[in-house]
Amino acid sequence: VRIDLVDFRSSGALQVVSHLSFEEIVSKLFTPISIGNLKLTHRVVMAPLTRSRADLPDDVPNDLMVEYYTQRASKGGLIIGEATTISPGARGWLAAPGLYSDKQVAGWKKITAAVHAKKGFMFAQLWHTGRASHVSVTGGPEPVSASVNPDYWNDPDKLTSTPSGWVQPSPHRELQIAEIAGIVADYRKAAVRAKQAGFDGVELHAANGYLIDQFLQNGSNKRTDEYGGSIENRAKLLLEVVDAMTSVWGVDRVGVRIGPDGKWNGMSDSDPKALFTYVAKQLNRFGLAYLHIIEPRVKGNVVVAEGQGPIAAEYLRAIFKGKIVAAGGFEPDTAEAVVAKGDADLVAFGRYFVSNPDLPTRLEQRLPLSDYDRNTFYTFDARGYIDYPAYMAGALAVPSA
């Protein structure tokens, strides 16, 4: 069987640029690759997935999470842990874990030890939700952002997870310039705690309409000071945080996740290609572990542009000089093709890892994939979390509610 690889850069008719056998494509996805000095045996990455299972009220990782990550660890495989808040004020999602207390570090230590016992690797994703939050989650302080946008908290489509269920975000305020150094310091402290917790590296969450993204994109950043206006100014916070994180870990144990032209959480920019081209160029100077790129065909956990090719990874491939992790709506065949074509070095899967704990094995051996149940993505208990089995013929049904 021969498979055509299509060049999405071409205007007009799509151009077939190469022909690879099915076996050649699969072999590329399952060839070794190094991330810094970490030697991975395959290129199937577990994407960061918020699952709302940490212990309340202190956002502490628990034994349920240990089992979940143990099930999904693989020899030489990379797991990027779920979005993890850097401070109480950074919180924005009920029962999402943190990395700002000793109890949280102790909880994460159990998880990283379990992943390492299976000879896998794990990065912590560091997260500040910014305006995408509610005072009942932050514990009192109003959410902060690059600028104030009342349309955001008045939009009935914008919802955040709280003790009272899914509600509209609280009104937010603009971060004062004197406060920004404290935000950067919180990222650095969380990076230190990630090292104490046994992670192999850290990823900055700079996508999906959270705080760093709110500074990057001019639909949300209306500032007139040194952190607003030009692309260079809007990218300043991102680069300061990367500086802080690399000062703890070294450059080759830090990754950055971006979402070019992403619309989740009300995001927009007047020239996203220019913005993210600049970001990728600036990140080149660090020599990072990887750049993690979410395709714009995905909005949150929904594919909104079915059939659209991986355009973001494709155009940034020519700009970013390090490893690229592509994410967002990939199927097994398209994941294999994007690596074979060279537009990405690794592919991150989210929803398929929810329902297929042994996903790398299934992809390599071409085994059937289990369906996932969206109704149990954020249910605070074991249902739809640790009850999806590894592959067994005839045992591929969605777990019962």
Where are the predicted features?
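Flavin-dependent oxidoreductase catalytic cores
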Residues: 21-401
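N-terminal amphipathic/basic-hydrophobic helices that include classical n-h-c signal peptides
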Residues: 1-25
